[in-house]
Amino acid sequence: MDAIAARALSVVRACVTVTDARVSLDPGVMETLGIAINRYNGLTNHSVSMRPQTQAERNEMFFMCTDMVLAALNVQIGNISPDYDQALATVGALATTEIPYNVQAMNDIVRITGQMQTFGPSKVQTGPYAGAVEVQQSGRYYVPQGRTRGGYINSNIAEVCMDAGAAGQVNALLAPRRGDAVMIYFVWRPLRIFCDPQGASLESAPGTFVTVDGVNVAAGDVVAWNTIAPVNVGNPGARRSILQFEVLWYTSLDRSLDTVPELAPTLTRCYAYVSPTWHALRAVIFQQMNMQPINPPIFPPTERNEIVAYLLVASLADVYAALRPDFRMNGVVAPVGQINRALVLAAYH
């Protein structure tokens, strides 16, 4: 499957470069397109030209690229246009070893496959406490029972209220609410001024401390915590105190937008509004794969096929912009006038 996806990606990327007839083509592009177009035309009875000039020729090349993307993704989209019929025989062209794939395309596909077969720490986009079901007001002392109490202020900040002379461990408070956290990077600080339950202003006692695995860490210093070593807090003073913990970032074994290179800009390109026709075509392809058709997913993709699909569809968007095909999609009405922000916003809603 890697070879088929790499060949499709190589052909689609090569087609981006052929729109200017005055430019000499790269030898690698000529070899790739020469073989790919011959195989495609022979199997599908199409007549794609290597140097498309007319609108019909540009349409034919874009349809070939669409066929190759769909074949690589094993997607059949059915009747979506009076001008385009998917050529199911395209997979036969991609399966042949005659079509070369370029180094970058194969590296991209192999990187995706390799990364999705294993796990590694990557930076998480959401805050560690985004899954908390309740929060509390910052700087408001609240210990209904016992001598210490911790709570969440927002998705990145937690606070610990302590009576005079109190101490305790805060591992459960600081650990993320979901996922397999590897390392958490936080800073802690005492709240200089806070309010008691009646609203009176109080000052934290001097000498409050935090230890990680028995080692004192200074307020304001970045602490790298593995979520296992004990994190203890103490208030040896004679007054109540509040300590604030701010998580700067943390890493997890969960998939992220850094799992493979350039995943974030690839998603942006996939879901960018190029035209009503492209907007509909992209939606149909993703719907057939049970992926988000209009807006990017809430969480980063977790499956190899999803990431390969994003890479191929983003490249198909580049070809669409380069070739400027003109064809109809069922149910799509061409907008009147220029595309503007209001029209695009309406398309996403």
Curated annotation (Swiss-Prot):
It comes from the Viruses. It is found in: Virion. Glycans are attached at N45. GO terms for biological process: fusion of virus membrane with host plasma membrane. Keywords: Capsid protein, Glycoprotein, Outer capsid protein, Virion. GO terms for cellular component: viral envelope; viral outer capsid. Pfam families: Orbi_VP7 (PF00897). One of its GO terms (molecular function) is structural molecule activity. Homotrimer. Major structural core protein; binds to structural protein VP3. Constitutes the surface of the AHSV core. Belongs to the orbivirus VP7 family. This is Core protein VP7. It comes from African horse sickness virus 6 (AHSV-6). The lineage of its organism: Viruses, Riboviria, Orthornavirae, Duplornaviricota, Resentoviricetes.
